[in-house]
């Protein structure tokens, strides 16, 4: 009996060790290691990936779809992820610093600036960001390309979408990649990422490394230098937004210009906890997330108060964009698929060089090409988005995968495509999607454009190539 008891205990211990080894640890917040984690240690990630690990992590990943809606020549005429910047630019902010705030669960519905009718007698939950929008360049029709945080980083930093599966989880993500941080690094920028969680809890560090970010500041870096107590550390995720943003401000002060800083906040994520010294000071909210959104907004205000007198501040482009819409929903229109993607997105420059309201459809994929255009970047680059200021020839359509179909959002129409045909279409102002316009002539044009994007996407996945190839540059030079 003793023999079997001992061996049973040994068996259980071995199983637990194997489980922890495959996950990469035992912490609740930790995501199991994936192929992209290799990018943290070398740019040649294939050199350190073992065959058994690759086999284990790719079982069930499925093969890449073969979409052949168009010939190669037809496809190139409709859509290409290869961008060749023009000589004439609407703005030239070359050499400016970049500070990019990726805002957790910042649905469009939280803002009174975006929704004055939703909050006729309230201030909304983002009063400080609303004040910046009043002086900034606001995209009033902006959309996320996914429903989860893990899908946001590839869309924003490398302009690559996720559809049926998060791009970062695909083995094909380990291809030739040149993200926005990589391009800026080649221009002499330092690149840093700030997120108050533990490293790799959401593959953030792994994908940030793939995208070209050199320096990663997380919970450990904060705890090594700053106060640790119940008002600074949230027990599940990591550092509360306010102390972490102030820590980020201090670190930025130490950087040489030009720099590119990306931050990803935590407090507006489930389980929606607030530090005790602010728990009773935030507005109650209509949903669980809104008091936390108000706290995150206040945290950004404190960051600006601390940084606004620093020498680097006036020479900086600030970008604010949500990672996705919160599952906590208040506005009726947010319940419908188009509204489930409607997010914050605006630019702010202290010298007011960028101001206005832009009603055209924009998406997370547009961040990288738009910023490259603002910085005067003149070399070819790879992107599934568009430079909203300098590429009027590219059609504007925000894409996503929701409810097992592809969604295409344009200025006047939203379509739903099952991979073979459009199954429904609705006018943009039909927010509750009651009147199906399936036979509308404009649907055919949108279907064609969406098919071209999807065919190009799956082709690039199969090639594992997310850069502009030399032959495309040669073809362009001959035109």
Report each predicted region and the residues it spans:
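N-terminal secretory/membrane-targeting segments
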Residues: 1-96, 113, 119-126, 133, ...
